[in-house]
Amino acid sequence: MSDKVLVIGAGPNRIGQGIEFDYCTVHAVWAIQEEGYKAIIVNNNPETVSTDYDTSDKLYFEPITLEDVLNIVEKERPIGVLTQFGGQTSVNLTVPLAERGVRVLGTDPDDVDRLEDRDRFSKLLKKLGIPQPESGTANDPEEAVEVAEDIGYPVLVRPSYVIGGRAMEIVYDEEDLRRYIEEAAKVSPEHPILIDRFIEGGIECEIDGARDEAGNVLIPGIMEHIEEAGVHSGDSACVVPPQTLPEHAQETVLEYAEDIAEGANVIGLINIQFVYDPEEDEVYVIEANPRASRTVPFISKAVGIPLAKIGTKAILGREIPEVLDEMGLEPPDGDPGIVAVKEAVFSFEKWPGVDPVLGPEMKATGEVMGIDRTFGAAYWKAQLAAGHELPLEGTAVISVADRDKPDIVPIARKLQRLGFDLLATRGTASHLREHGIECEVVRKVSEGSPNIVDLIREGEIDLIINTPTEGKDARRDGYAIRRAAVKFKVPYITTIAAAKAAVEAIELVKEKGVTVNCLHDIHKGDWTPREVKPEELTRYGG
């Protein structure tokens, strides 16, 4: 009998599929070797650890296509193929490989399809009694309008089977929807679009978990998204443990996650995304991915549990409690003893025409993390690592959409209390003054000079809070402000949730300073810090 296992890598780096999956691939290889098998990798990205000469027992530097993988399987005769660790690229090969008689290790290909296929997944959730946002599928523009009206605006629309939320958008009315169909998506029976109810003000969160054949489930923790629902999970900062998700909602998330893993007979890894609606006090399931996700490295490092390695051993027949015991690890209790923040890294300075506003279409090209004992300090460290050094003083410009004006008041008040001078565009300034917050009015780009962009160019602005607004002039103004911020390296924030987090971080660092700790010490529970003044830290670290 063969003693080889073939692992399919993630292929080239691109938005939505990056080096996080290579981390998972390498950990899978190490687990395979520890279990006494030879690990073979197929990947075609030279900028990865998985394609280093000494990572696997054999490397095939070939395209990640069905034909190439079948040729390798025919030559090597492995006991099976692992498709869970190369992101959506490798998962998409699961069913085609199984149909051609190849043994796919882990979750059965039919169960993979049950989680990937919208209709089958909806039926599974219905059977399990788990709610999901109302949704529908449209094969032509008129059907899309009907479905959206039945669900009720706003809705989230996207083509089926996408990586990184490409061509995904939140639409607020029929005119918006028709424009989306015309510009972004060709709708046909072969290429339907998916339409979901968008939960405004919802708190998104997700879990990465592993399950073995005996039914043991391991969930290291819940990652709460800092951005509001509607920002792609790959672009949103997230935090472990959750900071605003109620305790009972966290319990529901864990319960639903275990039910889905069991209901779909998952063997190996699974990622499930949820949204909590505070108004209805209801947790909804958005989607489940039967594979390693881009957050596996983050949650693994945040709680000190190598999830990809444990998931691989579960796929190879080991039981999770036994593996944890072997590694000297305790099952997580939901409190890692630290606060860890993951922040997305963007390359907007290299993309002159792209609006650096966050939305449902992924734009991040990497990620970093900050660790501390408080959320504010961890968030500040994550921003610093991502190249955004939050200012502790200076001038802040605020220009927000009408829907965000009630929420900006406490943020502006806190900035003023922290010693910032405030500038605001006319509408925002009027709202702030009504609530007793003094600020100067600054012109929008469309209102002539000197305007916000002129001040950014002259180095007079230290922080920008600018949420996207509707209307042609408003969109053009916002775009010009955000592009100027990128060009002149001024920290800019495009969501209310991120603004709240940033102000909390500024307040904490300004009042208490920040500490630097060794990662190894943190996982041993040793918090003997070196006190560091904020000014001693540079944009590139401490």
Swiss-Prot record:
UniProt EC number: 6.3.4.16, 6.3.5.5
Cofactor entry: Mg(2+); Mn(2+)
Catalytic activity: hydrogencarbonate + L-glutamine + 2 ATP + H2O = carbamoyl phosphate + L-glutamate + 2 ADP + phosphate + 2 H(+); hydrogencarbonate + NH4(+) + 2 ATP = carbamoyl phosphate + 2 ADP + phosphate + 2 H(+)
Superkingdom of the source species: Archaea
Annotated Pfam families: CPSase_L_D2, MGS
UniProt-annotated stretches for the region Allosteric domain: 390-542
MF terms (GO), sorted A to Z: ATP binding; carbamoyl-phosphate synthase (ammonia) activity; carbamoyl-phosphate synthase (glutamine-hydrolyzing) activity; metal ion binding
Co-factor note (free text): Binds 2 Mg(2+) or Mn(2+) ions per subunit.
MGS-like domain segment(s): 388-542
Pathway(s) the chain acts in: Amino-acid biosynthesis; L-arginine biosynthesis; carbamoyl phosphate from bicarbonate: step 1/1; Pyrimidine metabolism; UMP biosynthesis via de novo pathway; (S)-dihydroorotate from bicarbonate: step 1/3
Keyword flag Ligase: yes
Binding-site list for Mn(2+) 1: Q273, E287
CDD domains: MGS_CPS_II
Single Gene Ontology BP annotation: L-arginine biosynthetic process
GO CC annotation: cytoplasm
Entry binding sites for ATP: R158, R197, I199, E204, G230, V231, H232, S233, Q273, E287
Ranges where the record places region Carbamoyl phosphate synthetic domain: 1-389
ATP-grasp domain: residues covered: 122-316
NCBIfam families: PRK05294.1
Cited function: Large subunit of the glutamine-dependent carbamoyl phosphate synthetase (CPSase). CPSase catalyzes the formation of carbamoyl phosphate from the ammonia moiety of glutamine, carbonate, and phosphate donated by ATP, constituting the first step of 2 biosynthetic pathways, one leading to arginine and/or urea and the other to pyrimidine nucleotides.
Subunit structure: Composed of two chains; the small (or glutamine) chain promotes the hydrolysis of glutamine to ammonia, which is used by the large (or ammonia) chain to synthesize carbamoyl phosphate. Tetramer of heterodimers (alpha,beta)4.
Domain remark from Swiss-Prot or TrEMBL: Corresponds to the C-terminal section.
Protein name as annotated: Carbamoyl phosphate synthase large chain, C-terminal section
Species, as recorded: Methanopyrus kandleri (strain AV19 / DSM 6324 / JCM 9639 / NBRC 100938)
